[in-house]
C-alpha cells in the first residue's frame, strides 16, 4: 500500500518490521532443482501437475501469506514477453531463469508449431503472488535508494541476489547514485516477481514524481477470439497502453459504491 502511494518512509518502516520478525529466503543454489517431465521438459522442483495438491505451495518458506495467481484452468500457461526474457541479462548465472523458465514449452508440451519458453512456478497456471520475504527485501532496497541511502540499498538487494544467483563476481550490483540504484533495483524486482506485480509497478512508476523510472508505452498484438474460436487466420488486433492511461484504473466494485451512499465514484 505505502509503496504504491509513493510513501517511501512508511513502506521502508513496515518492510523492515517484517524482516525483523522473519527474513528467511530460499537459496536457489541448494534448495531448488529440476525434475524431468516425460516429454523431455525440465520443470522446477516446486512444480506439481495436480493443482489441487498444496503441499509445495504451503512449504514455500518465503511466503508471508499464501496466495498465487491462477486461471482456474490447469493448462493455462504464462508465456513471457521478449522484454521480460531480455530482463534476465545473465541467463547463465541467474537461477530464477534456469528453474522457472521452461525452454521449448510451447512446442513440446502444447504441440505448437513453434518453440517458445513458459514461466512456471507451482504449476502451469499457479504463480506465486502473495507477499514474501523476497518482496520485503525489494521494498526495503527501493525505499532506501529513493531516500538517498543507495549504498545500503545495494547491500539489501545483493542479500537477495546471493540466494538467486550462482556464486561469483556477478552477484553484487553496484550503484554510484540514487537514479542508478533505483533503476537496478526495479530491474531486479521485475526478474523476481514477473506476472504478479508488474501491472501495479507499471502503474505506480508512471505516476510518481520521477521520470527516469517511467515504463514506456506497452503494445501487444492478439488474435480476435470468442468462447470457442481463435481467429488466427485474421490479422491480429494491436492494443496499446499509454503512460498515465486511464486503462490502468480498475473498475471499483458496484457494491463498494452502493454502500458508500455515493461518496465513492466509479473510475471513468
Roles of regions detected by a PLM:
Residues 1-64, 68-74, 83, 88-268:
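Acidic/polar-rich alpha-helix caps and helix-coil junctions
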Amino acid at each position: 500500500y505505502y509503496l504504491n502511494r509513493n510513501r517511501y518512509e512508511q513502506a521502508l518502516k513496515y518492510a523492515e518490521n517484517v524482516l525483523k520478525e522473519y527474513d528467511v529466503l530460499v537459496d536457489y543454489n541448494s534448495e531448488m532443482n529440476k525434475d524431468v517431465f516425460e516429454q523431455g521438459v525440465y520443470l522446477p522442483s516446486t512444480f506439481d501437475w495436480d493443482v489441487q495438491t498444496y503441499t509445495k505451495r504451503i512449504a514455500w518458506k518465503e511466503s508471508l501469506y499464501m496466495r498465487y495467481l491462477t486461471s482456474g484452468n490447469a493448462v493455462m500457461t504464462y508465456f513471457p514477453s521478449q522484454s521480460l526474457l531480455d530482463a534476465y541479462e545473465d541467463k547463465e548465472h541467474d537461477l530464477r531463469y534456469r528453474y522457472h523458465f521452461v525452454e521449448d514449452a510451447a512446442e513440446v508440451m502444447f504441440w505448437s508449431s513453434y518453440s517458445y519458453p513458459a514461466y512456471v512456478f507451482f504449476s502451469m497456471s499457479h504463480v506465486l503472488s502473495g507477499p514474501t520475504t523476497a518482496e520485503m527485501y525489494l521494498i526495503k532496497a527501493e525505499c532506501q535508494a529513493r531516500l538517498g541511502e543507495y549504498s545500503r540499498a545495494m547491500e539489501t538487494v545483493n542479500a537477495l541476489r546471493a540466494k538467486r544467483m550462482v556464486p561469483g563476481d556477478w552477484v553484487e550490483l553496484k550503484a554510484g547514485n540514487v537514479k542508478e540504484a533505483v533503476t537496478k533495483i526495479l530491474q531486479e524486482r521485475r526478474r523476481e516477481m514477473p506476472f504478479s506485480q508488474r501491472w501495479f509497478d507499471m502503474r505506480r512508476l508512471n505516476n510518481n514524481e520521477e521520470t527516469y523510472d517511467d515504463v514506456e508505452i506497452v503494445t501487444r498484438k492478439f488474435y480476435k477470439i470468442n468462447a470457442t474460436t481463435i481467429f488466427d487466420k485474421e490479422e491480429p488486433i494491436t492494443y496499446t497502453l499509454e503512460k498515465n492511461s486511464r486503462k490502468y484504473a480498475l473498475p471499483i466494485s458496484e457494491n463498494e459504491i452502493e454502500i458508500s451512499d455515493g461518496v465513492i465514484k466509479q473510475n471513468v
